[in-house]
Amino acid sequence: MPLRRHLLLFAFLLAAVPAWALETFGTSELTVQTASGPQKFSIELALTDAQMEQGLMFRRSMPASAGMLFDFKTPTSVTMWMKNTVIPLDMLFLDPQGQIIDVHERAVPFSTDIIASKLPARYVIELNGGTVARLGIKTGDQVTSPYFK
């Protein structure tokens, strides 16, 4: 096989690897109780180590009412980053009862800067960047979900 064909085949296989390696996620619904009323979201659940490592990496878009919930099982000092994440995100850090204890707005795509919770958190919810400001979500708001039961 000529060298050019080998290179094209290699490039194709290399491009396809992330698609093979991508995790699949379960889904649930959640509601954020804000001062202006309930805000509903359809979320994907990142529950395993592999799912949490992948998160929203490589996604080029996400519906406005969608997000991802990370469950760390017990309250811990949570650190996140945006490596290989194409879209800007808002992050909500929650305690075990679903109360928002910290918010990080508009995390920068592809950044490897560490985003840490100020307090130990059990859950992190990632939403499209700008959602927190648009809906008035803030520290102290309560999040409910069938997943929490």
Per-region residue spans from a language model:
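Bacterial N-terminal signal peptides that target proteins for export
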Residues: M1-L8
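Bacterial N-terminal signal peptides
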Residues: L8-P18
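Compact, glycine-rich, soluble single-domain proteins
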Residues: L22-K149
